[in-house]
UniProtKB/Swiss-Prot annotation:
Name this protein carries in UniProt: Protoheme IX farnesyltransferase
Pathway, per record: Porphyrin-containing compound metabolism; heme O biosynthesis; heme O from protoheme: step 1/1
Assigned protein family: Belongs to the UbiA prenyltransferase family. Protoheme IX farnesyltransferase subfamily.
GO cellular component: plasma membrane
GO biological process: heme O biosynthetic process
Gene: ctaB
More info: Carbon 2 of the heme B porphyrin ring is defined according to the Fischer nomenclature.
Amino acid sequence: MGRCTIADVAMLIRWRVSLMVAGATFFGAMLAVPHVTITHLLASLATFLLAGGCSAINQVQEADLDAVIPRTASRPIPCGRIGHMYGSLMGLALVTVGWMVLCLAGGLTSLLVGIGIVAVYNGLYTPLKRRTSFALLVGAAAGAMPPVVGWLAVGGHPASPMLVVVYTLYLLWQIPHFWLHAARDREAYRKARLPLPLLSLPHERYARLLKVWFHAYAVAVLMVPAFPLLEGVGMRIMVTLCGIALLFAAMLAVRKRRVALHIADAVLCAVMVVLLIDRLAIPVSLF
């Protein structure tokens, strides 16, 4: 193992992604209880630790794949700056501490959810990536859980329509987001022999399937103003426009990949902000 730096550790835990996971957890907690408590902060810290631990373990599991994909080849394990044992121990330590903090924040239910996330992501999704082109469906199920963790940790009802809609939004967003990102490294994924849909399916079928996911994502967004989840008329109009933007992005998904990706990501952020503003009862005027 070569010399390990703080930058290497940050790359190992993918701190930006982990921070976004923590933000999604905080968002879910604020939707359930719209004022900040210590539980909000502990749940967010717990998911940051869990995301970092899952990332470290994942990079140990996929070190051989990371080495042949340009986007990931500079990660510390493929480059030899961090050894497999060190990466595994760090990942397990972060996950363990994350579980402890999550149990402190939300009790046994939150702990079980946290254990389930790690089991699905590292135990199912990561190995399945080498076997089936639709492993992302499994990974997305775990990836959509951070808002749920936050919601449950602060005592939100598990069968709330708001929670179901938010989980669905995160779930459906991940598929086109990942597929559009993967298109950038198409040849590297082919070299790594990963059975992604854009490689294993004929182009026409892949394009149709990508559009179907965009349409499903758009429908989920349009469900928000259709159901009594928003109080303000202005908020409903904003979310409706977001859904229309996704329908437009579906038409660009194949020809203008980067534009479609930016729209998909921006819509998720916009809907999160709208839901939070509406929940906090912040007055907003469109005119």
